Amino acid sequence: MHPIRAGEAAGAGAPTVEVSLGEVALVFLKLGTIAFGGPAAHIAMMEDEFVTRRRWLTREQFLDRLGVANLIPGPSSTEMAIFIGYEKRGWAGLLVAGCTFILPAAIIVGAIASAYVRYGTLPQVNGVLYALKPVVIAVVIQAFWKLARTAVKTAWLGIVALIAAVSYALRVHEVLILAIAAILAGAPLLYRALRTRPLLPAFFLTPMTPARAVAIFAATSAPFGLWRLFLVFTKVGAVLFGSGYVLLAFLQADLVDGLHWLTERQLLDAVAVGQITPGPVFTTATFIGYIIGGTPGAIIATIGIFAPAFLFVGISGFVIPRIRRSTIAAAMMDGVVVGSLALMGVVAWQLARAAIIDLPTLVIAIVSTALLLRFRVNSVWLIAAAGAFGWLYRG
């Protein structure tokens, strides 16, 4: 498989930056080490790194991949990393980008899990998080502003985005919101097309349904042990949409209520560790795997929960260019994109309410937003400064 160059899917004017696998690895190792704040913040950092600074992708290409990442199961920010690696270096880049983005968080979470098993408690990191969260909000606001200016091409798409945001605030499921956004965005073109000629469905995006069914069946029938642990987490990675709170519900049903491998306190501690460490929240699996099966369990659980994402992205990489060649399908993709941004905006608002709790955090958020939007300061320095301030002020 030859690498897919960024210009191929988006046409003239797209970046054609050539990069090595080593450069892909180094960039995603860096991002995996500093990417605090959950998927919205991770995606914001990737937009700044790969669209604004390195110009590996156009903003339109980035938005297309973001739309698909929100449509397929699994961790959206990890899938974005895999997409970008695939764009620049084909299948090798897909593996390298995904693995190097996951690796720092997995190592950190594994170390915390080791201390947790030994001492029965979590390290105290409240001071660092106190100052870090407002900076994360600023990073998300910066990305949302830049992406929205590109994605909302018409007044109708703006209305679709507003409908999606209100629906999400009313707790409508994310996948249903994206489906409705796609239908609404494509409706005008679809109506005109149906008036002139019969139309086959534009596209279907139900990746690997048989494989997902096999994973679910196997996870409920395999014997106890590391193999069963692997299948449980593969099932979760193959069917999970949504946030870390959705992950909590899946793991509660399987590991606490079903298999009785964890207590509720251990599960909540595991999700907390996934939230406070950099990189994908799904490295919660690393923590749980270590508690259940030591180092082998941590490795097996991590591979299991992330493996479906690599497969889904590899398949979706063939779909995106075909979607863009169809006028109606492209319009529906635009709907998915603005729907995804609407979800991102509502999540940013929810996170801001939790992060900005007093005058110092409000000042940090405002100053960070101004530095990012007006002076384009690298978010890495803001994160480092905020972490140090929080440690000294509240540690």
Language-model-detected regions and their locations in the chain:
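Multi-pass membrane proteins that catalyze or facilitate reactions on polyprenyl-/lipid-phosphate substrates
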Residues: M1-I72, F83-T277, V281-G395
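Conserved beta-loop-alpha segment that forms the PLP phosphate-binding cup at the N-terminus of a helix
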Residues: S76-E79
